[in-house]
């Protein structure tokens, strides 16, 4: 009896596999599961999904992943990219997926000396001695320190920013939005120590952060207005010698010709 039982089980397994092989379908097409059919009548039954009698073949069909054409293309590109990453490539055509990935990776590799930095770190860095323009910046700083009626003693960072702004080709006027945005970026990136130096320790301790930065922005606006007026009155002191600089153009402009009347009335 035991031998006959094992033989029956083996026959059932063989017939189940045969039916599975005959009933293979293209999984790339949407599939509607049927609870029975000529190819599944003799296959083992399992009671699944709310008590419906489903064959083992149909269960495998239901568990199969249905891939769309876009998913197939993406999988193919992924396999190509893995082959390129893990081993030598037999073709010269780079898959689209690898090209996209490499273009993203190459953004930072093109300049390995540049490191990612927070806005604070980028804007509060000090001008080091190896900077070739440091002597020029120091001279400009000393010039701006002599401008009267400044709200506070201008720092090297503030002086360099305003020196660059006053030489802009367009938008260098203190009333322009471009100038206001540049000063606002400086306010947002100024450290607490620099705010205390500019406004004084008492003002910083008693006021809120918003009031502190608003006050600092007001000071910068006043300072730049005076720097702008000074530089346009003395363009030789502030020009960066660029042909686009309004100060340089002002220096090289021909003098105004004064026409005297021929006859006195």
UniProtKB/Swiss-Prot annotation:
Q: Where in the cell is it found?
A: Secreted; Host nucleus
**Induction comment from the UniProt entry of this chain:** Expression is up-regulated at the earlier infection stages.
What name is this protein filed under? Secreted RxLR effector protein 16
Residues of the signal sequence?
1-19
Function recorded in the entry: Effector that acts as an elicitor that induces cell death and promotes ROS accumulation in Nicotian benthamiana. RxLR16-triggered cell death is dependent on SGT1, HSP90 and RAR1, but independent of the somatic embryogenesis receptor-like kinase SERK3/BAK1, indicating that it acts independently of the detection of cell surface pattern recognition receptors. Enhances the expressional levels of defense-associated genes involved in the salicylic acid-, jasmonate acid-, and ethylene-mediated signal transduction, resulting in disease resistance.
Q: What keywords does the record list, in alphabetical order? A: Glycoprotein, Host nucleus, Secreted, Signal, Virulence
The record lists the organism as: Plasmopara viticola
What are the coiled-coil residue ranges?
A: none
The primary site where this protein sits is: secreted
What UniProt notes about the protein's domains is: The RxLR-dEER motif acts to carry the protein into the host cell cytoplasm through binding to cell surface phosphatidylinositol-3-phosphate.
The UniProt annotation puts motif RxLR-dEER at 46-61
User: Hey, which family's this protein in?
Assistant: Belongs to the RxLR effector family.
Q: How is it modified after translation?
A: N-glycosylated. The putative N-glycosylation site at position 240 is essential for cell death-inducing activity.
Mutating residue 240 to A leads to what result? Impairs host cell death-inducing activity
Q: GO CC terms for this protein? A: extracellular region; host cell nucleus
Glycosylation sites recorded in the entry for this protein: 170, 219, 240
Outcome reported for the amino acid change (mutating residue 170 to A) = Does not affect host cell death-inducing activity
Q: Outcome of residue 219 to A?
A: Does not affect host cell death-inducing activity
């Amino acid at each position: 009896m035991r031998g006959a039982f094992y033989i029956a089980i083996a026959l059932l397994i063989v017939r189940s596999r045969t039916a599975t092989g005959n009933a293979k379908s293209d999984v790339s097409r949407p599939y509607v599961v049927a609870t029975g059919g000529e190819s599944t009548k003799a296959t083992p039954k399992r009671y699944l999904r709310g008590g419906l009698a489903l064959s083992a073949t149909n269960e495998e069909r239901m568990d199969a992943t249905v891939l769309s054409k876009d998913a197939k293309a993406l999988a193919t590109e992924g396999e190509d990219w893995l082959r390129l990453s893990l081993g030598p490539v037999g073709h010269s055509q780079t898959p689209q997926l690898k090209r996209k990935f490499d273009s993203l990776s190459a953004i930072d590799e093109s300049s390995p000396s540049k490191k990612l930095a927070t806005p604070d770190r980028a804007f509060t860095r000090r001008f080091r001695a190896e900077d070739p323009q440091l002597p020029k910046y120091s001279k400009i700083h000393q010039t701006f320190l002599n401008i009267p009626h400044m709200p506070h003693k201008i720092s090297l960072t503030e002086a360099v920013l305003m020196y660059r702004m006053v030489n802009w080709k367009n938008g260098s006027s203190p009333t322009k939005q471009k100038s206001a945005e540049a000063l606002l970026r400086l306010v947002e990136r100024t450290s607490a120590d620099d705010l205390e130096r500019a406004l004084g320790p008492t003002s910083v301790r008693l006021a809120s952060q918003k009031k502190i930065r608003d006050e600092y922005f007001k000071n910068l606006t006043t300072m730049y207005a005076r720097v702008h007026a000074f530089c346009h009155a003395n363009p030789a002191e502030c020009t960066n010698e660029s042909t686009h600089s309004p100060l340089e153009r002002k220096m090289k402009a021909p003098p105004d010709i004064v026409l005297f009347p021929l006859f006195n009335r």
